[in-house]
From Swiss-Prot:
Catalytic reactions of this protein: Endopeptidase for which the P1 residue is preferably hydrophobic; Endohydrolysis of RNA in RNA/DNA hybrids. Three different cleavage modes: 1. sequence-specific internal cleavage of RNA. Human immunodeficiency virus type 1 and Moloney murine leukemia virus enzymes prefer to cleave the RNA strand one nucleotide away from the RNA-DNA junction. 2. RNA 5'-end directed cleavage 13-19 nucleotides from the RNA end. 3. DNA 3'-end directed cleavage 15-20 nucleotides away from the primer terminus; 3'-end directed exonucleolytic cleavage of viral RNA-DNA hybrid; DNA(n) + a 2'-deoxyribonucleoside 5'-triphosphate = DNA(n+1) + diphosphate
Region (Dimerization of protease): 513-517, 561-567, 600-612
Domain Integrase catalytic: 1223-1374
Site (Cleavage): 135-136, 365-366, 382-383, 431-432, 445-446, 512-513, 611-612, 1050-1051, 1170-1171
Gene: gag-pol
Chain span(s) of sequence motif Nuclear export signal: 16-22
Residue sites binding Mg(2+) 2 per the record: D1053, E1088, D1108, D1159
Protein name stated in the entry: Gag-Pol polyprotein
Protein origin, superkingdom: Viruses
Positions of Integrase-type zinc fingers: 1173-1214
Motif extent (Nuclear localization signal): 26-32
Length: 1550
């Protein structure tokens, strides 16, 4: 600002204000034009300091002069302004701009010796030789040279796009910045725009269309002579197939130049215009002024939309003259029509100031009221005759402002002076000081007649004073919270801009200087470098100070105020510095009781009086889809609670937090009340559990509480509490209905009163998230305005810390309180903490330290599970600052499934641990605050019993401490636990301080690296240092990584029978020793551990042990130092004694074990594992060639697990992880289909998903018919049930759908180029093209080579599932599917049958067993886990009709024999085994066979009549019955049968 004020000083500034803007015009230059010119210079990379001298102006003119002929209006205005400033520096007297422009150009011509010529419009503009402007193509030595675009130009383009977001300003901005550019430069500009890819795509499409049109209009000519430059194609103009040199040659060749740069610019402009229309869809015909919208705001919207309209200037001019007036509101339209034909925009803005706004309405209302009922201020006014109404604008009588047709006069309606409107007229305000009539003539402008004849500027009462006061009061009442903006007096043109800037800065919160009114706004000002304390007074018209001397150049004035008149000296054009701004204004000096800056200086400073109106927008909340609100009944309440709830609800209703629910609201949630902590007041609670279930989900924005150790050290701390935090934030109006609740009445004396919440309710799941989000939005401006202040907010607690002085800190706190209070939040004084100690988050804060609030451990005689949980919680809370706290044995007291009220039995270890914790808590500990400049360190110590403690500190000051006692594994060691502790501390430090501390670990580096080399995958470990703090973490035994030469090798195995719990553990050695131990009540894992212990116990100091149990291998490899398992502890003791132990794992080697087969092999002395000798060659093979797993298993015959272990052990082949891929349907009938293109041909590709088999061929066109024919051909060759494609028009055509329907194919569609939808065929397209490229030279046509490539891919590509080719795999899958279906059909015939059988000479029937297979001579039966083969002659097959039931239900019945006969019940084993010795077999009765329908649970009584009158039942019933005729049947059966069928089952021996 200082540079701009120093451009013109003294007489030069006065001379500037005499120069007219146009010849014969009224307007003259002002200082604001210099400010504008200084701002514009920055766009051209020119310093504004050049305006301060004649030589600097000459440099500016040399740069701008070549650009003027093709420049924008802004550039021409800047050139004209610099010409005027140059003339003033050169002391050339000029009257207007044109005269100054001629003088400056004449000087430039004389200086350069020749005038610049206009460039030819048919080719791109370029600067003349020797001149270097902002042109990418310049002429040097007769040749055109390309100069890359400057970073300033590119930065200006990117900034333009980012700020305007493809608004209407982007197109002219691009025109200006791309002037003279080549296509290469334009592409460089487009590539700089990174985030607006949608708009860039639109531009690319326009470029492609225009390039195609260019190619069609400019066909390629015949062959060109050697050396002749070709004509540009569309892609050449776009810069994709041409070089920069070619582009320059086309642009500047002597004959037939082609301005490729300008052509490409036009294409880009078309694309930008399309983007502008897309991003600004409002049509200019829709831009209409609102009924209360200021005219200036309407004009801004109109011209913004006008810029986006891509029409010629004539149409835009018509729109400006016609639409601007036509779409104005009625009030402004009436004023604009009175201005006559074609008024200027400045005249329209001036005439419509204040029209239609609340201020004008209030003024008209006040005038009407005054004329209708207001008494005259003159005592004798009633005796005088009232004159007719005279309108001041035209001077005619008989009408008011609304009916006047004359053009409005410019200037103030009150005093007639230009430069301000009546709303800001100094004579209209009741100022504190007024200028007296000394030496001043009365204004000659027309005014309302003064009955008293007194001068209107005198201090006595004037006729309009009452009217003005009432109008001002009405305006104040109407405008309410609208801010009063004090405007300049320099022509009136800065006022609209000031108003607009004020409105635009409204969302910046506290970024601008503000003065709250809790005290008088007094600032220090420097008047001509003399410091003065002044009061900022918006009620005073003028400024007056005392005690300074400003010289003799003054005018005497008399001003009147509350205390009377005082004599003053008025000084004009005085330099004043206040609030880091410099202005020049008029000031008076005199004997005033207080120094005052009035509106004349406040306006120059750009200050305004604002009343912020706070409003928190509610966040929209909905229920989950398909859910409805709660409809629960209110449960009964006591009279005391009902009265308490009634009082609470009435208070909340008065405060606007509740409102009465309408009778149409169907929802309800139960409410109740509980006593607060003080037991005197009640708290209302709503049971929102049901509403929470159906409310949409929320995310907690603040995931944890802030820790005091993370606070930076500050001198001042204050803590605010937001009272009724939730109740200060509105609930969305559409959601309020679901919060309805009812207050019942005692004995139902009256209907219950129903309420709904208008604010966030307590207990509702959305309240915390919405409150956290809202508070963040509220406090964000404050944080930005006060970056040196730490503001920590957690729910309703706010901590403010700073290094400011006490007074400045209190100001910030008060400012925050006012901000919160203005938004409707309360900050209760009783909860405001100003002095330490501060109670915050369970801690006590001091300026230099923090500590926990006093902890009190509970004292109880009987402890329950809940009491222990609370005790452990208190101790864990204390562990953040009290080092040494342990809870391991306390937690063991409540291990297992226990109820909260169950009594706990204390152990001696737990009691000792509690007493130790009490001693630790008795010594008060303190923590310190974080200092960012110091290093953060963490020291870890190991306590007893695998418990760890750590402290995080800076130098010797401890920030916080902690403990760790979590053991994730039963068998572990100290190094693994140490890694877990470090990981916990690292995460904690990242959360609290955002950085990783430097660790001091109690472990030797050699010990750590020995373990870490093999177990680096365990976790992440940051930088650390060794610290000698006993007890050190050590590894207790020496595991080596390579086999020990010469040491005995033990091969171990163990097994166990799950039913009998008996097992065996045994080993063999390479030296012929073996040992087997029988175990009882064991498990497989215990047997494996036992044999490992046996091998250690029976071996020498060095040993190689081979195991087949990953369980054992995992325990031993972890090098545990302690375990809860007895055998593992014995293993640890044995391994400590060894010098070296090598342990290796091989999968499930046979020959050793505890089962029957392995025990037999051990007894025979077969000790070899057959594939062990091939492991070493396989490892060598992999080390040489890094073979894959499949190759190792195929070549060396080793198991897949061994091969995978070899590959995973290789550092080069080790994979840290794999990407997570999507899954596709791989059923046997699923195919995927897609199109691909190669050498201009269309190839249709179909892939069998499960096998990778491919079908492809070249088709003439990409249409639905061709696709349908190919699909029909494919379906005739292979079974296809499902076809998956993209959703292209050819695949969704009717032809393809018809073929799919006819063949019976299910279609599904995905998204094009989405790898998770049709990724198989997309990948196959790529492989097909690669295969074609390998064999392309073997055929001429693309049709042939495609079929050849398909053959290679189907029959020569082995691998994958089954190690087959895709063709073999597909045929195998189809064959397998057929076999499976056949076997399933066969097996389904046996699943409902059971088999009873005999074995050997045993005559007892056994079973039943499950029938697996029935052959010609035998059947296969499954009994339990055994599978038996039984001859047909010793087996009885019966049908199973269901499981065994009670006797009165359906028992198991016999099924039909194979030859159609029914099996006799006496042959059923369960019956036959109960037959008495020597009993005869049953025989059918003579009178016929009786059948019993036991499956249905009843015995039929109806029989079919026959000629013999026999009791034969229905034929259908016989299929479900069993023949009952035997000598001995259960008594229950006998009773039933004897009663219903007396002739059934009679036997001579019965």
């Amino acid at each position: 600002m200082g540079a701009r004020n120093s451009v013109l000083r003294g007489k030069k500034a006065d001379e500037l204000e005499k120069v007219r803007l146009r010849p014969g015009g009224k307007k003259k230059y002002r200082l604001k034009h210099i400010v504008w010119a200084a701002n514009e210079l920055d766009k051209f990379g020119l310093a504004e300091s050049l305006l301060e001298s004649k030589e600097g102006c000459q440099k500016i003119l040399r740069v701008l002069d070549p650009l003027v002929p093709t420049g924008s209006e802004n550039l021409k205005s800047l050139f004209n302004t610099v010409c005027v400033i140059w003339c003033l520096h050169a002391e050339e007297k000029v009257k207007d701009t044109e005269e100054a422009k001629k003088l400056a150009q004449r000087h430039l011509v004389a200086e350069t010796g020749t005038a610049e010529k206009m460039p030819n419009t048919s080719r791109p503009t370029a600067p003349p030789s020797g001149k270097r402007g902002n042109y990418p193509v310049q002429q040097a030595g007769g040749n055109y040279v390309h100069v890359p675009l400057s970073p300033r130009t590119l930065n200006a383009w990117v900034k333009l796009v980012e700020e305007k977001k493809f608004g209407a300003e982007v197109v002219p901005g691009f025109q200006a910045l791309s002037e003279g550019c080549t296509p290469y430069d334009i592409n460089q500009m487009l590539n700089c725009v990174g985030d607006h890819q949608a708009a860039m795509q639109i531009i690319r499409e326009i470029i492609n269309e225009e390039a195609a049109d260019w190619d069609s209009q400019h066909p390629i000519p015949g062959p060109l002579p050697a050396g002749q430059l070709r004509d540009p194609r569309g892609s050449d103009i776009a810069g994709t197939t041409s070089t920069v040199d070619e582009q320059i040659q086309w642009m500047y060749r002597p004959q037939n130049p082609v301005p490729v740069g300008n052509i490409y610019r036009r294409w880009i402009q078309i694309g930008l215009q399309k983007c502008v229309r897309k991003y600004n869809p409002t049509n200019i015909l829709d831009i209409k002024q609102g009924p209360k919208e200021p005219f200036q705001s309407y004009v801004d919207r109109f011209y913004k939309s006008l810029r986006a309209e891509q029409t010629d200037p004539a149409v835009k001019n018509w729109m400006t003259q016609t639409l601007l007036i036509q779409n104005a509101n009625p009030d402004c339209k009436l004023v604009l029509k009175g201005l006559g034909m074609n008024p200027t925009l400045e005249e329209m803005l001036t005439a419509c100031q204040g029209v239609g706004g609340p201020g004008q309405k209030a003024r008209l209302m006040a005038e009407a009221l005054k004329e209708a009922m207001g008494p005259s201020p003159i005592p004798f006014a009633a005796a005088q005759q009232r004159k007719a109404i005279r309108y001041w604008n035209c001077g005619k009588e008989g009408h008011s402002a609304r009916q006047c047709r004359a053009p409005r006069r410019q200037g103030c309606w009150k005093c007639g002076k230009p430069g301000h409107i009546m709303a800001n007229c100094p004579e209209r305000q009741a100022g504190f000081f007024r200028v007296g009539p000394t030496g001043k003539e009365a204004s000659q402008l027309p005014r309302d007649p003064s009955p008293s004849g007194a001068d209107t500027n005198s201090t006595s009462g004037r006729s309009s004073s009452g009217t003005v006061g009432e109008i001002y009061a009405a305006r104040e009442k109407a405008e309410g919270a609208e801010g009063e903006t004090i405007q300049r007096g320099d022509g009136g043109l800065a006022a609209p801009r000031a108003e607009r800037d004020t409105s635009q800065r409204g969302d910046r919160g506290l970024a601008a200087p503000q003065f709250s009114l809790w005290k008088r706004p007094v600032v220090t000002a420097y008047i001509e470098d003399q410091p003065v304390e002044v009061l900022l007074d918006t009620g005073a018209d003028d400024s007056i100070v005392a005690g300074i001397e400003l010289g003799d150049n003054y005018t005497p004035k008399i001003v009147g105020g509350i205390g009377g008149f005082i004599n003053t000296k008025e000084y004009k054009n005085v330099e004043i510095k206040v609030l880091n701004k410099r202005v020049r204004a008029t000031i008076m000096t005199g004997d005033t009781p207080i120094n005052i800056f009035g509106r004349n200086i406040l306006t120059a400073l750009g200050m305004s009086l604002n009343l912020p109106v706070a409003k928190i927008e509610p966040i929209k909340v909905t229920l989950k889809p398909g859910k409805d609100g709660p409809r629960l009944k209110q449960w009964p309440l006591t009279k005391e609670k009902i009265e308490a709830l009634k009082e609470i609800c009435e208070k909340m209703e008065k405060e606007g937090q509740l409102e009465e629910a309408p009778p149409t609201n169907p929802y309800n949630t139960p409410t109740f009340a509980i006593k607060k902590k003080d037991k005197n007041k009640w708290r209302m609670l709503i049971d929102f559990r049901e509403l929470n279930k159906v409310t949409q989900d929320f995310t907690e924005i603040q995931l944890g509480i802030p820790h005091p150790a993370g606070l930076a050290k500050k001198k001042r701390i204050s803590i605010l509490d937001v009272g009724d935090a939730y109740f200060s934030i509105p609930l969305h109006e559409d959601f309020r209905q679901y919060t309805a609740f009812t207050l019942p009445a005692v004995n139902n004396m009256e209907p219950g009163k129903r309420y709904i919440y208008k604010v966030l309710p307590q207990g509702w799941k959305g309240s915390p998230a919405i409150f956290q989000y809202t508070m963040r939005q509220v406090l964000e401006p404050f944080r930005k305005a006060n970056p040196d202040v730490i503001l920590i907010q957690y729910m309703d607690d706010i901590l403010i810390a700073s290094d400011r002085t006490g007074l400045e800190h209190d100001k910030v706190v008060l400012q925050l309180k006012e901000l919160l209070n203005g938004l409707g939040f309360s900050t209760p004084d009783e909860k405001f903490q100003k002095d330490p100690p501060f109670q915050w988050m369970g801690c006590e804060l001091w300026p230099t330290k923090w500590k926990l609030q006093k902890l009190q451990l509970p004292q109880k005689d009987i402890w329950t599970v809940n009491d222990i949980q609370k005790l452990v919680g208190v101790l864990n809370w204390a562990a953040q600052i009290y080092s040494g706290i342990k809870t391991k044995h306390l937690c063991r007291l409540i291990r297992g499934k226990m109820t909260l009220t169950e009594e706990v039995q204390w152990t001696e270890l737990a009691e000792a641990e509690l007493e130790e914790n009490k001693i630790i808590l008795s010594q008060e500990q303190e923590g310190y605050y974080y200092q960012e400049e110091k290093e953060l360190e963490a020291t870890i110590q190991k306590s007893q019993g695998h418990q760890w403690t750590y402290k995080i500190h800076q130098e010797e000051k401890i920030l916080k401490v902690g403990k760790y006692a979590k053991i994730k594994n039963t068998h572990t060691n100290g190094v693994r636990l140490l890694a877990q502790v470090v990981q916990k501390i690292g995460k904690e430090a990242l959360v609290i301080w955002g950085r990783i501390p430097k660790f001091h670990l109690p472990v030797e580096r050699e010990t750590w690296e020995q373990w870490w080399d093999n177990y680096w995958q365990v976790t992440w470990i940051p930088e650390w240092d060794f610290v000698s703090t006993p007890p050190l973490v050590r590894l207790t035994f020496n595991l080596v990584g390579d086999p020990i030469p010469g040491a005995e090798t033990f091969y171990t195995d163990g097994s166990c029978n799950r039913q009998s719990k008996e097992g065996k553990a045994g080993y063999v050695t390479d030296r012929g020793k073996d040992k087997v131990k029988v175990l009882e009540q064991t498990t497989n894992q215990q047997a494996e551990l036992e044999v490992f212990r046996m091998a250690l116990a029976d071996s020498g100091p060095k040993v190689n042990i081979i195991v087949d149990s990953q369980y054992v291998m995992g325990i031993v490899a972890g090098q545990p130092t302690e375990s809860e398992n007895r055998i593992v502890n014995q293993i640890i003791e044995e391994m400590i004694k060894k010098e070296a132990v090598y342990v290796a794992w091989v999968p499930a080697h046979k020959g050793i074990g505890g089962n029957q087969e392995v025990d037999h092999l051990v007894s025979q002395g077969i000790r070899q594992v057959l594939f062990l000798e091939k492991i070493e060659p396989a490892q060598e093979e992999h080390e040489k060639y890094h073979s894959i797993i499949k190759e190792l298993t195929h070549k060396f015959g080793i198991p897949l697990l061994v091969a995978r272990q070899i590959v995973n052990s290789c550092a080069q082949c080790q994979q840290k992880g794999e990407a997570i891929h999507g899954q596709v349907n791989a059923e046997i009938g699923v195919w995927q289909m897609d199109y691909t293109h190669l050498e201009g041909k269309i190839i249709i590709v179909a892939v069998h998903v499960a096998s990778g088999f491919i079908e492809a061929e070249v088709i003439p066109q990409e249409s639905g018919r061709q696709t349908a024919l190919f699909l029909l051909k494919l379906a005739s060759r292979w079974p296809i049930t499902h076809l998956h494609t993209d959703n292209g028009p050819n695949f969704t055509s009717q032809e393809v759908k018809m073929v799919a329907w006819w063949v019976g194919i299910e279609q599904s569609f995905g998204v094009p180029y989405n790898p998770q939808s049709q990724g198989v065929v997309e990948a196959m397209n790529h492989h097909l093209k690669n295969q074609i490229s390998r064999i392309r030279e073997q055929a001429n046509t693309i049709e042939t080579i495609v079929l050849m490539a398909v053959h290679c891919m189907n029959f020569k590509r082995r691998g994958g599932i089954g190690d087959m080719t895709p063709a073999e795999r597909l045929i195998n899958m189809i064959t397998t599917e057929q076999e499976i279906q056949f076997l399933q059909r066969k097996n389904s015939n046996f699943k409902n049958f059971q088999v009873y059988y005999r074995e050997g000479r045993d005559q007892l029937w056994k079973g039943p067993g499950e029938l697996l297979w029935k052959g010609e001579g035998a059947v296969i039966v499954k009994v339990g886990t055994d599978i038996k083969v039984v001859p047909r002659r010793k087996a009885k097959i019966i049908r199973d009709y269901g499981g065994r039931q009670e006797l009165d239900s359906s028992p198991h019945l016999e099924g039909a024999r194979e030859d159609g006969e029914m099996a006799c019940p006496c042959q059923v084993p369960e019956i036959q085994n109960k037959r008495p010795r020597g009993g005869a077999l049953c025989s059918p009765p003579q009178g016929g066979m009786g059948m019993v329908d036991l499956q249905q649970g009843n015995i039929p009584t109806t029989r079919k009549k026959s000629s013999r009158n026999t009791g034969i039942l229905e034929p259908n019933t016989r299929k479900r019955m069993a023949l009952l005729s035997c000598s001995k049947i259960n008594l229950v059966y006998r009773k039933v049968l004897d009663r219903c069928y007396p002739r059934l089952c009679r036997h001579p021996n019965t």
